[in-house]
A protein has these predicted regions:
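Flexible, low-complexity linker and terminal segments
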Residues: 1-210
Length: 210
């Protein structure tokens, strides 16, 4: 299990609430075939897009000999066989694009605070959240209201695109020198770059509301 977080959360456990583990939790491992399912198949093809969503079924090593497959760093076709055929290679790469579009419907949706009366919005990520919520409270007392969207995953979901469409200007707040979140929004979403105003704090001090 790989747990990815930004530096502030990784180094300061006061940034988040204590984890409460649910013993009843069962992870959704996706399209994993059981030994019985593999046995009932005529042939298992690791990279075959059966459902049309770009996500092939997979097996866990040791489940069933029929579910084994050979993987390599160079080209393979949709059936898992080695190939140097250009059309077969492109077929696999095109399937990955379908998988990418499907992922947009499966990743966690953003947290959104929205009012139709607000023309400006804030988009941010990770440990910027508390500082932004505090800043919005302060600004609200000054009759300056901004909507807020906290990104939780990439690729961006349709909710992110709608938030971009619904505002005249978006302030993208992040603790990153290069403004990576801003660049991803401009390159991956349909948005006029002039609408994006990048606000970056990257001097090593945790972000604060001022």
């Amino acid at each position: 299990v790989f747990v990815l977080s930004d530096l502030d959360i990784g180094m300061n456990d006061w940034m988040i609430k204590d984890l409460k583990w649910d013993d009843k939790f069962k992870p959704d491992r996706g399209k994993v075939l059981s030994s019985e399912e593999i046995e009932n198949m005529e042939t298992f093809h690791r990279y075959l897009d059966v459902d049309g969503d770009g996500i092939p079924y997979r097996t866990i090593p040791g489940t069933n000999p029929k579910g084994s497959y050979f993987t390599r760093g160079s080209g393979h076709n949709r059936f898992g066989g080695y190939t140097e055929d250009a059309s077969e290679y492109q077929d696999v790469v095109d399937r990955l694009l379908v998988k990418w579009e499907t992922a947009k419907t499966l990743v966690p949706k953003p947290a959104v605070s929205f009012s139709k009366s607000n023309e400006f919005g804030i988009i941010s990520i990770g440990s910027c959240d508390d500082a932004i919520r505090e800043a919005r409270d302060v600004m609200k007392k000054q009759d300056q209201n901004l909507n807020y969207l906290r990104v939780k995953a990439f690729p961006f979901t349709k909710e992110v695109q709608k938030f971009l469409d619904d505002h005249e200007m978006i302030f993208v707040v992040e603790q990153n020198r290069d403004g990576q979140l801003s660049k991803l929004l401009i390159s991956e979403a349909e948005v006029d770059p002039k609408k994006i105003k990048s606000i970056r704090l990257y001097n090593g001090i945790p972000i604060f509301s001022k």
